[in-house]
Amino acid sequence: MRTIKEKKEHPRLRKTARTKKVTHRKLSSGPVCLLCFQEPGDPEKLGEFLQKDNLCVHYFCLILSSKLPQKGQPNRGLHGFMPEDIKKEAARASRKVCFVCKRKGAAIRCQKDQCVQNFHLPCGQERGCLSQFFGEYKSYCGKHRPTQNIHQRSFGESCVLCCEDLSRASVENIRSPCCSQAIYHRKCIQKYAHTSAKHFFKCPQCNNREEFPQEMLRMGIHIPDRDAAWELEPGAFSELYQRYQHCDAPICLYEQGRDSFEDEGRWRLILCATCGSHGTHRDCSSLRPNSKKWECNECLPASTEDSVSENLGDTPCCSSTFCPHEPFLRATSLEENPGSSWTNWLQPSLLEKPESSSGSSCQSWRSKGIKVTKDCKKSK
């Protein structure tokens, strides 16, 4: 009898051990998210890892949780999510099983009607689920997610951003709405959106700022509402506040060297008035004691050409051929042209019938400064 009981107990032990293996989570040495039980991970996929009062959670897990309200102001709690509400949501999610990993704690549910799929955010991303970061922040399983019409022949092409081959899985590729031939990797577009942010995010090919961001939001791309990443780097524009401090004259006469100067006087450093990236001491370029304007050799030819073109206006280069001593006047309307042209001097009757012209025409010709021929005198 003892052997029969032992045989009956062994399967039970094996069964309980198997169930413990499924429900038991891998222990982590560091903090984990309360809503997905994952470590900080990639901020482009899971968002910023927030910690406050022994409460750790991913930013994307907060805003995508199905039943978590945002009751506070943005400066309270974790971006407006109160700690007590987060704990209540974690307690509710502890009764929901993820359809991917078969573990409890799934706080995100598919928003399609009559769909009961629940999942953790990292698990859903691996299985093709999609989350939208606008409006009601809806999430969908792989069966009900928004899709695009990407032709099968496009899979042999390359991504416009990374120039590598496109993935065979259509959920990992995104087609541009404004440039229909352009297809990107989802991870490339997400990295581009995370770097450029809302104010600089546009189509990489045609610079579309309206249709392109809207389609990317629909397809689950997170576009942060902040300045671009290159503007948030500490000291990114520090060189713009540095003044040029070097004498670039062919021969520097200052005893202390080219990198030294005085605030006033002969050895004051004068910067180029056009570019500001070259300088000289007053005495090194033979400037007047009170002069404050100087131009380097690189900017001087350009400024000289600009001044010449402004003085000449619309004067053509061949004006000296017509009149070497007087400025050339274009044949425009009478209001613009103060002088009379040759066609205005000749009357229509004289041009058509010269023999019928009277002596008054010769008088008018003399008044215009034109010599009268002998034929005209005879007719007079």
Curated annotation (Swiss-Prot):
Annotated stretches, region: Required for interaction with ubiquitinated UBE2D2: 150-306
UniProt cross-references to SUPFAM superfamilies, sorted A to Z: FYVE/PHD zinc finger
Cystine bridges: none
Keywords: Metal-binding, Nucleus, Transferase, Ubl conjugation pathway, Zinc, Zinc-finger
Residues annotated for Zn(2+) 2 binding in this entry: 98, 101, 120, 123
Positions that bind Zn(2+) 6: 247, 252, 281, 284
UniProt xrefs under PROSITE patterns: EPHD, ZF_RING_2
Residues holding Zn(2+) 3: 110, 115, 141, 144
Record note on domains: The extended PHD (ePHD) domain is required for interaction with the nucleosome core particle via binding to DNA.
Subunit structure of this chain's protein: Interacts with MEF2C; the interaction promotes MEF2C binding to its transcription targets. Interacts with GATA4; the interaction promotes GATA4 binding to its transcription targets. Interacts with UBE2D2; the interaction inhibits cleavage of PHF7 and promotes association of the complex with the nucleosome core particle.
Identification of the protein by name: E3 ubiquitin-protein ligase PHF7
Name of encoding gene: PHD finger protein 7
